[in-house]
């Protein structure tokens, strides 16, 4: 290829806009040429001519001449030294001195200023890369939940000027920095984030400008030495979920093996994408270049996170939201959840309720003359007629969930039919009603929630105003601290109203913690592992068995301990945790023996700990979870196939074999042991 001819102006532009080294080298070369040129011209003068008066500096005439010229070049005040010399000498020295003034006093200062300005500009625009950064947290993409993740990583609970933020005095050197890669305007992103953070944390946040689908940009994040990664993608970016998934594959290659497995938390914006990821096997995609596992792929969805914050065990610890069964369930009582708005948030709440709402007063088949008291869920949306076919195509087997009735209403919550339903259920003592307003527009959602029928909020009996038990949840997608505080402090009409869905509270460590699920999975993996058909887990389980054999040899009284018994013993937890973690990584999300949804039921199980129906409740939960994932009951054929999502155990609890019922019993026993290490989180 013929080399392009570059004009002089273009060369100058490249130098000016180049890096620090390029500008400095160009300056010194040009300055050196100017000095050399004047030195050569000085040879035209006679040897008896001096440029620095008669003062002898080095005892050598030639060196004194050169030194005198350099002194003039560096200091214009030395011009007086040429007094008495001829006009030609004075003019020559003046020109040389002037060149020094221009180059050293002008061009050098300009070059250094330009370098500093460029550096500042590059930092502000995210163009500066720090190659030695390590033990840092990485956030790829900028979106609504970014500030929430930063607050979580730093342990911040208040606003920018809050005094309840984590005290980092003396911890500056140990606090892990956060590196954010975004394709958005870095200046704007920095301003938005810093406006919501205490000032003392700003020094620990770094910004890179780049694209999520660029290998070089991801490589610049020092993935090989990172502590944890969050892949969020950019807000409203086309193909966001697909790009996030592709980015994870790049991270797996860059991480390499021989290091601690890196946790990569990946946000999937659409519930459909999130559900698909949970159904398919991705194990081979997320390995290092040598084929070994290098990362722990941890998908999450903002809307599901909020549903779990409302009602799940981990999310509900210590928060303000009441359970759906906010009273003790008696024989004829039932939970009734009304969801207004069938958008992503509404669907997430529906799916979470389907996993959670399994109670001891449901009797399969009306056994012993008792009723089949089912949970009721009503979903209201004015576009339901168009939205429902798509939803049922995505979740085709929800009709396998036998203890929950779902009703889809094409209309508005303002319709007389819906308003009358809310009043009737509020007045029905057996109905535990919760209304969740999930509209996307914060103002519309607020006005809709506060304009429900008055009888939903209070009643008048014996000439006295009494609050009803109905709970009302109002989605506020934006950060609405002011409105939230007003509602929280209201002890009158709106005392049972709470806001939810805020973007600054959608992610927390409790929600992302899979330890309990990991331990339960390890329990079943070890219990049912077939040593006659060894696979990739064989070495892990073999090491575990050897370790346990040594412990039992030292103390035979521990011979009956199972994995859960060992893991709750502080002196053995480290080894057991590592074993559970390795086994957890070998299986895809929906192939594990336990998951976060099972743990989310622990609060409900704890509330009804003395009920003989706990095992049935666990099986009903499992049926619901498998149905949501996409498993079809194959009880008639007896086929069990994970690839085709067929399972023969999606049947009533009483129809299960004794062996299968024992699995549900084990879940309850394991729950009791694991929860013995924690304060009981159940709420009445």
Task: Identify the residue ranges that each predicted region occupies.
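Cytosolic regulatory regions of ion transport systems
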Residues: 1-35, 44, 48-62, 77-621, ...
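Short, motif-level signal for alpha-helix interfacial/capping segments enriched in acidic residues
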Residues: 631-642
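C-terminal non-catalytic accessory extensions
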Residues: 664-672
